């Protein structure tokens, strides 16, 4: 039942938020800056206009508020950054993105 709710929630997301989830699901690194770069590249490939970093981060906060991601503060070298962790199976975001953009 939880899987069905997650699938419905992801299906109802706007394209930008879906691409953010896809980038988080398929990126080797879970650091926010790396996920943002993957998100931007995907948008450019598909002819979508990417969010600015500020709007990207705001949309990540929205995704956290609906329970799809968790942002975890992490110290890297001497600076603090966030990691993005999905709260569901990454293959769900990958398959829904593939269906919507191909």
Model-found features: residue ranges?
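Winged-helix-like regulatory helical subdomains adjacent to P-loop NTPase cores
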Residues: 1-38
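Terminal-proximal interaction/regulatory segments of ATP-powered molecular machines
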Residues: 30-102
């Amino acid at each position: 039942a939880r899987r069905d709710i997650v699938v419905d929630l992801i299906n109802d997301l706007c394209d930008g938020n879906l691409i953010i989830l896809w980038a988080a699901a398929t990126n080797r690194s879970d650091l926010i800056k790396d996920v943002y770069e993957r998100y931007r590249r995907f948008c450019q490939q598909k002819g979508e206009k990417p969010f600015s970093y500020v709007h990207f981060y705001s949309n990540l906060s929205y995704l956290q508020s609906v329970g799809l991601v968790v942002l975890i503060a992490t110290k890297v070298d001497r600076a603090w950054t966030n990691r993005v962790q999905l709260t569901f199976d990454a293959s769900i975001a990958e398959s829904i993105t593939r269906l919507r953009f191909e």
